[in-house]
Every structure is written in structure tokens, then in C-alpha cells.
Amino acid sequence: MNMKILVLVAVLCLVVSTHAERHSKTDMEDSPMIQERKYLPPGKPCYEATQKIPCCGVCSHNNCT
């Protein structure tokens, strides 16, 4: 009886660790800290309130500087 419980616990630990490892890899791939950031170069038009890609400098008079 004790051996069955021990085997069950070992199998559950293996399944949980495999599942967690798989999810940690996808989290690393989706992480914005690891992905290369994209910026608008100077001279490109920008709109501070609605732009999705930030300027590499500052958005001034609707142009990246």
C-alpha cells in the first residue's frame, strides 16, 4: 500500500514539473523583457496618445526627435 502511494506521488511530481517547465518556456518566449524592442526612428510621424510603437527619443510636434 505504501509503495503505491509513493509511486503515485512520484508520478504526480513528474507530471507537475513537466507542465510547469513547458509553461515557463512559453512565458520566456512571450516576455517583453526578452524580445527586442522596436522604436520609431527620428523624423517619423508619431501621435503620443495613440501610438503603439514608441519613438527612440521624444514625440514632439507629431514627429519623433
Curated annotation (Swiss-Prot):
GO cellular component: extracellular region
Positions annotated as propeptide: 21-37
Keywords, comma-separated and alphabetical: Calcium channel impairing toxin, Disulfide bond, Ion channel impairing toxin, Knottin, Neurotoxin, Secreted, Signal, Toxin, Voltage-gated calcium channel impairing toxin
Signal peptide: 1-20
Disulphide bond pairs: C46-C59, C55-C64
Coiled coil (residue ranges): none
GO terms assigned for molecular function: calcium channel regulator activity; toxin activity
Statement: the UniProt record of this protein carries the keyword Disulfide bond: yes
This protein's record includes keyword Disulfide bond: yes
Tree of life domain: Eukaryota
Tissue spec: Expressed by the venom gland.
Protein localization: Secreted
Annotated family: Belongs to the neurotoxin 36 family. 02 subfamily.
Chain's role: Reversibly blocks N-type calcium channels (Cav2.2/CACNA1B) in rat dorsal root ganglion cells. Elicits no toxic symptoms in either vertebrates or invertebrates during a period of 48 hours post-injection, when it was assayed in vivo by direct injection into mice and cockroaches.
Domain description: The presence of a 'disulfide through disulfide knot' structurally defines this protein as a knottin.
Listed name of the protein: Hainantoxin-X-3
Source organism: Cyriopagopus hainanus
